[in-house]
Amino acid sequence: MAELACFCYPHLENDSYKFIPFNNLAIKCMLTAKVEKKDQDKFYNSIVYGIAPPPQFKKRYNTSDNSRGMNYETIMFNKVAVLICEALNSIKITQSDVANVLSRVVSVRHLENLVLRKENHQDVLFHSKELLLKSVLIAIGQSKEIETTATAEGGEIVFQNAAFTMWKLTYLDHKLMPILDQNFIEYKITLNEDKPISDVCIKELVAELRWQYNRFAVITHGKGHYRVVKYSSVANHADRVFATYKNSAKSGNVIDFNLLDQRIIWQNWYAFTSSMKQGNTLDVCKKLLFQKMKQEKNPFKGLSTDRKMDEVSHVGI
């Protein structure tokens, strides 16, 4: 995750702003600079290489002292920064909005995946600039639309029906901010269209998840898509979701946290997010993740007969 101000800076033209990507030499200069405390939140002028990000964001970059940041000296950083600027420059950002836009925290890996989709000549985003920019505006929170299959970050498609597409995320192969844990495995499920879904399609998805991904929990971060994650990583996801939700509420950005379909979401996660929306503390909410829940009546009778036992997957073993 990183603020948009880590990728670009605004330049006032007439009554709106044009966004310009940083180059990595300017960032490198900023990372070595001594800056007074009062200037930490201001864009840094490297004199030689142009404008650089505010020094308060130093920890967002990978250095000898901080291996958890972005690999800003890669070509991928430049590609992501340019893509963000293209999207922001396609709309009008006024002086009253610019600070809020640049302070927004976005998923670096999501944006790298959109670059990969853009460069894949078999992908619809390669052929449609309009759809590409729409995908980026959704990714950076500038659009209220949810991420659907056409505008998704992408990955490897492992399941699809008339309503849903399930992607295996490819973060291990990333250049900008790769996941280093070689045991990482996670999926995302997007809606093909943002419209009501038939019970038949939901039943097909639940059957797939129950038989092929029975070692995973289905959760949501509230943004209109599902995540399929290892049970061992659920607590970590809970911490992140709770922190994001509370920070947004504190800054006055009211989030419409989408709980999604209770028949698909893991029961304990649904309880956790419902409790969070009611205003309870993190400790109170997290206890619900580890409680034994009363099994609800199966909304899909006969579901277990949809697959033969020899089809049970070993994904996640």
Swiss-Prot record:
Its cofactor is Mg(2+). One of its GO terms (cellular component) is host cell cytoplasm. Residues 205-241 are annotated as: RNA-binding. It is found in: Host cytoplasm. SUPFAM superfamilies: Rotavirus NSP2 fragment, C-terminal domain, Rotavirus NSP2 fragment, N-terminal domain. InterPro entries: Rota_NS35_C (IPR048306), Rota_NS35_N (IPR048573), Rotavirus_NSP2 (IPR003668), Rotavirus_NSP2_C (IPR024076), Rotavirus_NSP2_N (IPR024068). ATP binds at residues 107-109, 188, 221-223, 227. Keywords: ATP-binding, Host cytoplasm, Hydrolase, Magnesium, Metal-binding, Nucleotide-binding, RNA-binding. One of its GO terms (molecular function) is nucleoside diphosphate kinase activity. Its EC number is 3.6.4.-. The active site is at 225 (for ntpase and rtpase activities). One of its GO terms (biological process) is viral genome replication. Signal peptide: none annotated. Homooctamer. Interacts with VP1; this interaction is weak. Interacts with NSP5; this interaction leads to up-regulation of NSP5 phosphorylation and formation of viral factories. Interacts with host DCP1A, DCP1B, DDX6, EDC4 and EIF2S1/eIF2-alpha; these interactions are probably part of the sequestration of some host SGs and PBs proteins in viral factories. Participates in replication and packaging of the viral genome. Plays a crucial role, together with NSP5, in the formation of virus factories (viroplasms), which are large inclusions in the host cytoplasm where replication intermediates are assembled and viral RNA replication takes place. Displays ssRNA binding, NTPase, RNA triphosphatase (RTPase) and ATP-independent helix-unwinding activities. The unwinding activity may prepare and organize plus-strand RNAs for packaging and replication by removing interfering secondary structures. Belongs to the rotavirus NSP2 family. This is Non-structural protein 2. It comes from Rotavirus A (strain RVA/Human/United States/Wa/1974/G1P1A[8]) (RV-A).
